[in-house]
């Protein structure tokens, strides 16, 4: 399972979605062409970003099945690592956008 860190995007949801589709998506598609399951890692953002991020990950998962594509929103490396480990052990989970809270998320997910 490959991690793809999206990198900084504008604060506004519309501008962030536009930059993602114009600049980041081609790199994501190239990564998926390698044939490995993929986890996108976004920086945390407010609720206005949820819709476009979820739509992206769901469409990528549909178009690239049987590969699995999921997305996380987190800054905490331990939370990202725990979620990545969970997703690696959950073969039926795909097309999900999971905002993470690093406060205890690592321990909770590692017990699953």
What is each residue range found by the language model?
Residues 23-26, 54-55, 67, 72-112:
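C-terminal helical subdomain
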């Amino acid at each position: 399972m490959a991690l793809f860190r999206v990198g900084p995007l504008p604060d506004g949801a519309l501008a962030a979605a536009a930059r993602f589709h114009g600049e980041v998506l081609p790199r994501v598609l190239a990564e998926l062409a390698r044939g490995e399951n993929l986890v996108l890692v976004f920086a945390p953002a407010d609720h206005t970003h949820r819709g476009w991020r979820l739509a992206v990950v769901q469409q990528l998962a549909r178009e690239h099945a049987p590969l699995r594509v999921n997305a996380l929103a987190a800054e905490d490396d331990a939370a990202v690592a725990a979620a990545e480990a969970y997703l690696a052990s959950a073969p039926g989970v795909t097309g999900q956008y999971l905002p993470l809270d690093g406060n205890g998320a690592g321990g909770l997910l590692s017990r699953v």
